[in-house]
Structures are given as structure tokens and as C-alpha cells.
Amino acid sequence: MTSKVIYKGSLRTEATHLRSGNTIITDAPTDNKGKGEAFSPTDLVATALASCMLTIMGIKANEMNINIEGASAEVKKIMAAGPRRIAQVIIVI
């Protein structure tokens, strides 16, 4: 098992990475009945994709002895309705 997620009520969850103990809080966004005080679950999906891209770039850069420290990604997530879902993720590296 990698993580454990607990529903805390009020449309909030707490996810714990079991090996390190690090935690992530999620909130439903304000446009979906939430508080919007933390990443939404769909924000994390889009953000995780960008994190994965930078990690893979880092692996290849290390193999090539190239320093990409400070590389960044800007993430834009576009939602669709009926049913509510991620319609598009735009990542600019």
C-alpha cells in the first residue's frame, strides 16, 4: 500500500504517504460546494501529471549529466459539466 486517504467531512480528505508520513489535504472547489482552501482532487490529478513529467525529465537529464534544477511547469486544468470531469489539462514547461 502506498497511501491511506481519510474523508474528514465538509468535502475534505487527508491523504498520507505511508512510507514518509507526508500528508496532502484536498478540498472540493468553491464552484462545487467546497471551501477551496486546498488543492481539489482534480487539481492533484493535473498537478501530478506535471510532477511526473518533470521527474521523467530529471531522470533523463541526470543520465545525460544535464542540470535542470529550477525547471518548472505551469498547469491549467479545464473542467467540463454534465457530468463534471476534467476536460483538458494544459502544461507549459
Regions found by a protein language model. Name each.
Residues 1-47, 55-93:
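Extended beta-strand/beta-hairpin segments
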